[in-house]
């Protein structure tokens, strides 16, 4: 995907790890997440890792904890293929946050697309 490669500064031969998760609250889906991480920053075999916990902690374990990010927010509906594949027809409107996270050296370490269920989240923003 060109957008992922550009966001993570990947070359044509570089590999990426894609993590797709649904986060629940009281057994109800409230967050649909897609994260992309450059394969080069995770030296372990992907199948040997526990992906169910915090991605930030995992990145920190390998010396790449995000220190800052650039994000955009928009009101959307979940993509239809996601709704059908995961049975999320009742998810409703969402706030999509698209974000690039950078480590302390300024290198991109995560490209994330998160869909926050509109009925369960509110955000406060400070703008300059």
Predicted features along the sequence, with ranges:
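C-terminal all-alpha effector/ligand-binding and dimerization domain
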Residues: 1-128
